[in-house]
């Protein structure tokens, strides 16, 4: 049985697109045939669950009972990969809880694979978040994600200052999520389907849909760029997936032909 892998996606600031990143991760693992389950900590409504209802459970990560739902089942759950979409403002408290229950020690000793995707905003406050999370990163794969999905400009950052923060965490890796065409992003939001199903022109239950050919093309191109970042960091290798055959591509899902006039 493969070693459990836990991926935490979060930020202490809201509005930086962390759930968007979680959605791209779930699509990526699905395309790579990596069984995955997800926990949406946007309690009680949830956001991630709207797009991936079959594999996502809404939890309140501030309660011990719901922490047990996630971590007591790591070795018994059929999917070996767990993605946790952490509510805005909860990243530092969540990492503190992982320390207190001994999870970080288990990761450091190699019993569990642990990765953190820290979604950064454009302000200096995001750099302070890096300093706050640094003490929790022993034994973790730490990814600093610049997410341009909201047309963010990282203009407030002095590069020398950023590098000072960046180097506080050993082996930290930077990722870039490019901007997606706004109309395409909005249409996927309205459709409430995974990006991959939107590209393939399918509904939640794989029924044929009638999404715009143009917008699907924008999403396909954008998702391919995101996945190339995940390929670059060898994400499937990190979670212990043995590769057989070539890496799947977004175009493999097919966008179909343009609609007939």
Q: What is the predicted role of each segment?
A:
Residues 89-190:
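Conserved catalytic-core segment of NTP-binding enzymes
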Residues 20, 61-65, 124:
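Conserved phosphate-coordination/catalytic loops
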Residues 28, 73, 132-136:
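A generic secondary-structure signal
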Residues 2-8, 31-97, 111:
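Nucleotide-state-sensitive switch-loop elements of NTP-binding domains
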Residues 1-29:
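Walker A (P-loop) phosphate-binding motif
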Residues 1, 125-130, 137, 214, ...:
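Catalytic cores of phosphodiester-bond-cleaving enzymes
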């Amino acid at each position: 049985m493969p070693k459990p892998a836990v991926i935490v996606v979060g930020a202490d600031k809201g509005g930086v697109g962390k759930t968007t990143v979680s959605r791209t991760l779930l699509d990526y693992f699905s395309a790579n045939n990596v069984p995955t389950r997800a926990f949406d900590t946007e309690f009680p409504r949830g956001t991630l669950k709207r797009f991936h209802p079959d594999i996502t459970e809404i939890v309140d990560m501030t309660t011990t009972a719901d922490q047990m739902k996630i971590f007591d089942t790591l070795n018994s759950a059929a999917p070996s990969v767990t993605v946790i979409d952490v509510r805005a403002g909860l990243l530092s408290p969540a990492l503190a809880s992982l320390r207190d229950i001994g999870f970080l020690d288990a990761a450091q000793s190699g019993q569990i694979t642990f990765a953190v995707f820290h979604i950064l905003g454009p302000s200096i406050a995001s750099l302070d978040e890096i300093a706050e999370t640094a003490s929790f990163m022993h034994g973790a794969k730490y990814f600093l994600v610049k997410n341009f999905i909201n047309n963010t400009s990282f203009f407030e950052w002095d590069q020398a200052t950023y590098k000072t923060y960046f180097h506080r965490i050993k082996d930290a890796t930077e990722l870039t999520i490019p901007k997606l065409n706004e109309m395409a992003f909005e249409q996927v939001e309205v459709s409430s389907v995974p990006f991959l199903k939107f590209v393939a022109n399918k509904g939640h239950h794989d029924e044929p849909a009638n999404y715009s050919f143009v917008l699907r093309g924008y999403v396909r191109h954008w998702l391919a760029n995101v996945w190339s970042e995940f390929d670059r960091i060898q994400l499937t290798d990190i979670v212990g997936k043995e590769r057989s055959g070539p890496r799947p591509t977004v175009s493999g899902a097919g966008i179909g032909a343009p609609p007939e006039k």
